[in-house]
């Protein structure tokens, strides 16, 4: 036989392809016989031994092996074909050192004859032939037919010298050219066999010219196969390793081999197995041949080999499933990517060619798919530029990706791409409102996560946050978060650079080049925790993931002593943290600046703050790449867009980031578009600004730049065809952001956005809201720039760019490890004298148990988390650092959940599972499946890093009335507990936070649902988070400091501007849904400063809210009145919230949702109070506080103005607003969903609309009866119904607040309703804003009742101020009720004001916050309402009975008793309007008299309730007398009382109150405001509150004692207060005051009450009250007829006269004028303060401008100085030179 002729370096595997001659020496040429194919491996390497001896290599034609190729080589084919140097050029190179070393090995396979091209032949001996056959069989069996599919065509190219390369015809470059039908059945079966699948797939990776996939797997293991056949030449051990490495490199670089993505993981495992089989023996041999004379080294090696053997067995057992590497628990990770660091994966990937693949990616992949999916019509539009369609052949035939089937008018679904068309949002795995039933169905609802201070999952990077940076993290409310940035890359720069540390480099046998940086430090904050020293470590491999973090010295077992100045041996530290690392390979690096700079460059390789973005211009009717590139110039719509996006810059001489554009010769155009965003510089490659080539269809000058941009913006004019990436041919364009203009070049121009990204690019934010358009604004610009930046950052995580970055990183590391190291090992004490062998080895001390739990970085546990949204579980890593809790999904290697540790409020743990509650009760669940101790460790860690605590589960029993005995507000916080009741005995305490009710998470429930669940469940099992030691509820940092997230109500068709505020860059405007009356009301964001100011008012003289002793029921747990909460979706909500915010001091609490935070108080303040400001420990009445703070209340939280302007005005002065988007409140869903933007019933908010009031009243009253205490229910429950009809905006506003109220667990919510109602009523009477013809927006009833009162008092401002108007209406309502009130009890009820209502009203008023409640008697309350009140009053008694024993403070919270069911403001059925107690201002603290009186009244009420008597009237009278006595010191209070009494004079309290349940005890309950009220409001409210017995906490059922019920003063005032939300009394009072100032209407004055000593005739009281009401009504009517609701003019005169007479007779003394004067004074002061603030701001702006000018001048002067000095220097030199010359 003739021998094979081949180069020494050509692998023998290709022998089967060489020509074979017969035994007689004559060469035989075989054509490509179909029947012979089965004997060869498909498309590949070795055939059978028979074929080796019989057949020639397969060829496309009958060309002889020595002939030239039959197909001409042109273009890329020619380059590829000639790539391996030809024989002539390589003859010497084949003798390179590496190849020479392996020559003998190859000679054993083939004779040393000349290459085939020389034509000489040498015969093979029998041994050679047998060995070849054996090799062939082995290869066939081991690598499988699949592995060799491409090898016979591709393998020759993998070698530097291929003797037959030049002579061999170009084969198909991929098996995709070979259809499966060309293979016979046998070979096909082999291809589809499992064995085949484990190797490379049948088809090649799609690729274009430079991305041909060559499979070199067989080359990787070739020398392993040869080892079995080389009997001699044992001295050549190292050679195969080097050659193998060489071949791997060649195959990688030359061929870009890759495996199909589909089979990638299997191939990785197979490669890992082959690598280990080959590498392990080499490792052992190299160890034994190192020649190291150290005994310790040898001993260590022996031990290592034993360990290696055992690990080899493990590897063999798990070769199909390589377990992820787990870092020791003692290691605290610095950032997220460190947690994802996987040492096993690094080992595997180092030898896996998959990272070297360079395949068709980006838009080209889509183009490829479009070709494969249809018949291969090589149309010009889709063919590749060189006409090589095979470049576009993809894996299409085998499981081609079909896209995501998401399309719209902007973008089409496309293979290999994923579309984002709006509404996608971020993944949510926690159990929260967003994924509960009420929200899940609303696709139109979208949360603008970018506005939330909650970091997005993709935006989480650094986990170890220094204490000094914590406050910075609180201020995360930046509009958009930059995502997918490895900010941990600064770890070396921050903690190592220019500090004492050690760098070690080396080449590990498994990991390749590695670099380790280690530093020992003594952190200041660690002293408290025990371990004084900490080791910071960075471990770098060729993989992009880097291990960064720290380990406490006490957590490291060591032979040395801990906590000494010398420290532990670094070797022991590294061996403990990274046991897989061979530390002996490490050598100390040079301590030079070059090394540190190179390390920083290596670490920060992935950080790039300069980005280039392409912009393609698509005109109407266009869709293809050529059409877009051939648009020579920009149209007006495009120019308008470009002007918004960036700055047009002249390229010539441009010195900033130029993005490969020519800035010298204008060869790439004269101008371009440039901009900056945050820290990023962005240069746009605008297609119309790049050079246009008239005769070049492809416009290569343009495509050269845009085609190489990763992110491209496609701007579409109206009428453009939907965009599809398949029309683009580019390997780099991975993300397209499609922007379509609507109504371009008009004032209403707006843009819609869609995104399509390559499938391996992770999703990125900010999310696109569904069905919205963005108006032209800076907000849209920021949104788009953030989207573009995040798109590029995310694209760098795709496989293509990661592979490129990995290669770069490997080269950096290699250079460092080879050229920048000393000979110093990591353990310099390496060799000891032999004598040391005899000594006993020193044992390592055990680490301090649990030491790592005090680390600042993230400690990690492997757990299984529950995805509540998808109802599935997934494996993940739980990381808990000092700042963050993160769950990282192992499969996707992405963060699935994150929250701040300061947001954790508690947890429920068992042996194997843990449920963590955070923020407002949302929760995540994890299970431990590795160690039973994991959960205990996690709990200890949570105790260390958070302020939460273990939850408590308890079963609650009902009392005889079916009541549970506690009040819960809408946040799930227990506001009051009946002393010694069943709930109290079970351990429930005020401030406890319910997180689960009957296994249902409270976070998923609305307040109404919560109450229903408590009321209807047979067995009530609750899980609570116990309060702090001072009884304040546990709150998350978000609730306290963070602006609430506003939930945008997106109805399709509404322009984006109405959904997001773009009017100001700083503010987000929200408008209600389409139906909303004032869609454009700008919600003003309150600047933090403003909020602080507002908050400050309350704070100034009060203890911190946390200290507040009581949580008003009506107030949200954060202290904001519940009713204040509006649905964020509604206009009113926005307005109200803004107003409320303006008033509320810190309404940030989630409860504040409603507060859009326009008003500074709510939104602006980051500090949330657990209680209303008014409720400080001192429990001062809010009113007083308001007053006290009035002067300081610059923000004018008291503004009652409904319009945003008001808040804006006050806020304007303040600093830039923070996002006030109200947090999405539980109330929101209903309101938001309702098309009109009305509050939905969902929140038991009382709707004010007068029409409904009556009905809802009754309904409500029943609700109210269901006090939370009674556990029955939330008054709110029926709230909505009250106003289902039309609600005035004010109603809505109040409703929102009411909703908050309802949160009170139904306590007094009804009252709230009325409060709102009253306000609404005002509006209604005025004309219920909705019902009224104008449906003018009633000022949001946000104003505290006092405000409303004050409004009423004042003269209601103008129609413009809806609030004022509402207030007026309220007044009018009152008047009406007066006029009508004379008649029956019903009328009295009408007056709705029945004391009960009044009381509640007052409460509300007192809370002041509920301005709306103030006048809320519903002007139109239907007769039914009136009737219902009676029922409610009945309820009231029970309430009172339940709370009869409660002391003043307890009374502070009105019970939800039915009594207050009708809010004071409810109208009579006839439509009479009862004025609400305008005592909002009552000062609770005022001489404490009010409180005492109130308490007593309540007590008496309770007593009455306890012993119901048929003659409730007398009882009530007595109670009233008592109240009057108590309040006598405050004439105003007396007046208030009188007023209330008047409001419902005829009917016994029970009747009237019945209509409403007492409001929650809010500040008003405290009577806090009554005395403080500047106006009659004060006294009335407080008296009323006191008078109302509704204070009873627990009546859940309507008490059957209708008459005896002494109405507790309803929380009506509370309701008002609630409206304000957290507003402290000061807020409301301030607001009222301000309004009062605004409205200079003279106050008719408080109705004088008789002295305490004087006898009171009940009938007289009633008459007086009526008369007074009439008088006031007429008074207000006169001041503003427009606002006067329904007062009967005919009767007004008479009534007025009567009232005057009665007032004279009854008033023992005139109202004190001092109050009014004080108010005026305060108002004047406030005005001055505002002016001063405005001036200060102007001055500040001027100063800033001056400073800027000075800086510019300074720079200019410096430059001039420098120039002058340079000139002087030159002159001096010249002078000296001339002197020297002379």
UniProtKB/Swiss-Prot annotation:
| Location of this chain's protein in the cell | Cytoplasm, Cytoskeleton; Postsynaptic density; Synapse, Synaptosome
Q: Per the record, where are the segments of Polar residues compositional bias?
A: 1080-1093, 1186-1205, 1378-1410
The main location class comes to cytoplasm
* GO cellular component, as recorded: actin cytoskeleton; cytoplasm; dendritic spine; plasma membrane; postsynaptic density
> Basic and acidic residues composition bias: which ranges?
84-94, 1358-1368
- Residues the record lists as Asymmetric dimethylarginine modifications: 1580
* Gene Ontology terms describing biological process: actin cytoskeleton organization; activation of GTPase activity; ephrin receptor signaling pathway; regulation of axonogenesis; regulation of dendritic spine morphogenesis; regulation of GTPase activity; regulation of small GTPase mediated signal transduction; regulation of synaptic plasticity
What GO molecular function annotation could you give as one example from this UniProt entry? GTPase activator activity
Name of a matching Pfam family:
SPAR_C
Where does the record place the Rap-GAP domain?
599-816
Residues in domain PDZ? Answer: 953-1031
Residues the record lists as Phosphoserine modifications = 162, 187, 193, 208, 255, 288, 1078, 1087, 1116, 1127, 1149, 1170, 1181, 1234, 1249, 1305, 1328, 1345, 1369-1370, 1391, 1410, 1412, 1507, 1528, 1533, 1544, 1547, 1564, 1567, 1582, 1624, 1626, 1629, 1687, 1690, 1707-1708, 1712
What positions are modified (Phosphothreonine)?
A: 1309, 1530
Chain intervals for the UniProt region annotation (Disordered) = 1-28, 47-125, 140-171, 277-297, 1069-1128, 1144-1213, 1247-1285, 1307-1342, 1358-1454, 1625-1647
Listed CDD domains: PDZ_SIPA1-like (cd06745)
Which keywords belong to this entry?
Coiled coil, Cytoplasm, Cytoskeleton, GTPase activation, Methylation, Phosphoprotein, Synapse, Synaptosome, Ubl conjugation
Q: Tell me which stretches of the chain form a coiled coil.
A: 1713-1773
Q: How is it modified after translation?
A: Ubiquitinated and degraded by the SCF(BTRC) following phosphorylation by PLK2.
Q: Where is the composition biased (Low complexity)?
A: 95-125, 1149-1159, 1261-1276, 1315-1328, 1432-1447
Task: Sum up the protein's function in the record's words.
Answer: Stimulates the GTPase activity of RAP2A. Promotes reorganization of the actin cytoskeleton and recruits DLG4 to F-actin. Contributes to the regulation of dendritic spine morphogenesis.
What does the subunit section of this Swiss-Prot or TrEMBL entry state? Answer: Interacts with DLG4, PDLIM5, PDLIM7 and LZTS3. Interacts with the actin cytoskeleton. Interacts (via PDZ domain) with EPHA4 (via PDZ motif); controls neuronal morphology through regulation of the RAP1 (RAP1A or RAP1B) and RAP2 (RAP2A, RAP2B or RAP2C) GTPases.
**Listed name of the protein:** Signal-induced proliferation-associated 1-like protein 1
Give the organism the record lists: Mus musculus
